[in-house]
């Protein structure tokens, strides 16, 4: 129902924010997995453990963020989450081949905290902005924005890796190209 987008600014902008958020973040796990394995030389299991920083922090803070968005304006809580997410992306933009693993984990933890403060409160803002009869449509819009954002994120990351690394396998000789592709992705995000 397109009238929700044209007649309901909170719904429209919160939906757009969801699209932007998921487009900015979904490829982070793939990019950082490549970084940890090919730049830092970690085995896949160790890389996976480092990557856990984001979802663990997100899982720890999401329930509190949801409760906070019930007490405060969910749009403001989601905006704070988006700002913290942006900080996390800036921190990842600064990651290089000499960055210690704890810095990578800290940046991922910041992303997880931002994600927690954004996701539930943004969904709360969207669902609170529509009437009960539009819950189904609003819920499907949230799911669509999430899916389109995730697909966009992976498409951009794939194109950047292809553009910078090319068709060769990732190895020590093209680590600088991989780092450049990551920086472009995080910069776009």
Residue ranges of model-derived segments:
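12-transmembrane solute porter fold
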Residues: 1-168, 178-189
């Amino acid at each position: 129902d397109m009238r929700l987008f044209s007649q309901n600014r909170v719904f429209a902008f919160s939906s757009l924010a969801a699209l932007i958020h998921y487009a900015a973040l979904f490829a982070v796990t793939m990019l950082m997995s490549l970084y940890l394995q090919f730049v830092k030389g970690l085995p896949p299991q160790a890389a996976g453990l480092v990557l856990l920083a984001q979802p663990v922090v997100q899982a720890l803070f999401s329930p509190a963020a949801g409760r906070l968005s019930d007490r405060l304006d969910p749009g403001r809580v989601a905006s704070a989450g988006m700002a913290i997410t942006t900080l996390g992306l800036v921190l990842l933009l600064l990651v290089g081949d000499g960055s210690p693993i704890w810095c990578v984990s800290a940046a991922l933890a910041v992303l997880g905290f931002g994600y927690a403060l954004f996701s539930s409160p943004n969904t709360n803002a969207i669902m609170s902005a529509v009437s009960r009869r539009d819950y189904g449509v609003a819920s499907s819009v949230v799911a669509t924005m999430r899916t389109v954002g995730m697909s966009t994120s992976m498409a951009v990351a794939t194109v950047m890796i292809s553009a910078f690394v090319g068709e060769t396998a990732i190895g020590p000789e093209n680590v600088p190209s991989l780092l450049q592709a990551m920086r472009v992705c995080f910069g776009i995000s």
